[in-house]
Each structure stands twice: as structure tokens, then as C-alpha cells.
Amino acid sequence: GNYAADGITTATLKKKDGFIVVKFEREGYVTLETKIFTTDKRKAVSYTMRRDAFFDVSVASGLVNKYFSVKISKDLYTVDESGKRNTELAWKMIHQVILNYFDEIQTTDMASGFIQTPWLYKSFPEADKQIRTRVSVKESNLGGDLTFQIKISSEVAPLIASQRDESFQEIDRIVKDLEPMISEFQARLGKL
């Protein structure tokens, strides 16, 4: 059966040929799993967990992996007499912000109102993890105002998983280098 314990714990094995699997988990540390056989004569065992480098270079964020809205400042677009909107300046600004953090933009389509970066990969060999991040932007018109819906996707996978999509899972953390991007979107484009 499963037994969860916290701190110092004692366990007794009844089978002579059995073993137990001990798994140590704590947020911010690399998970450690080991087997202890009944033939092991030690009276006590102790393990030291290593810090997870991934947690040291990332921060939790409630805005990753979901769209957030930025209402665009009226200084960044114009509307002519016929009601046609010129959003070129707003689009230039959002490209500038993205290119401060990403080397390239994979897709940009002003006509359909969509921008997406390629995945940006970062590896953490000592934690056996890799994280990938990308930005997607959709233009929308909430209440008649120009608004961008922005999503920063952040996913993690084991390092050995290569770059296969099915290996990655969403995580509520973002690499610290990219965290200022959220504030920059808000400050340079308009208001939340």
C-alpha cells in the first residue's frame, strides 16, 4: 500500500524477501526515489535532496497558459471618419516587446490579427527538466476598443524527452528572464 509521511518516520517490513520504494518529493527540490530491501542491515537511512535549479530560475505566475487582455492605448491606433481602424503602430509596438525576449516571430498576420513565436527551449540538466515558452497574441475588439488577447505558454518535460509535444505539460511557472515581458506588454501597449 501507499504510506505518506512527513519528517522522520519509522517503517517495519514483514516480508523477508521484500523491499519498499521510498520517494522523496518537495516543491523546489529534485524528486528522489530509491529501493530499500529487507536484507539491508542499516538501522537508519538518510538522504539529502538537491535544490531544483528550475525552481531557482523561474517564478510562479497566474497569467501563464491562459489569455489575458490588454486594452490598447488610443495613442497606438487611429480611427478614420468611415470607422476604419489603423492599428499599424500598435502592431509595431507588440512586435518590439516580443522581440525583446524572443529572437524571432514564427507567425504574424495583421489581417487576421494573430502573432505567435516559436517555442523557446531552456534546459536544466541538474534537475533533468526542460521548459519551453512561447507567446500567442490575438487581436480582439472588446466593447469597440482595440484589445490584444495575449497568452504566454509555459510547459515542462523531462530532459530526455527530446522536443516531442506529448512529453510537455503545462506548468504555472515562467523563466525569470521572461517574467518582465508581462509588465512590458501592459505598460507599453495600454492597460489590463
Language-model features: where?
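Ser/Thr-rich, low-complexity intrinsically disordered terminal regions
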Residues: 6-12, 16-192
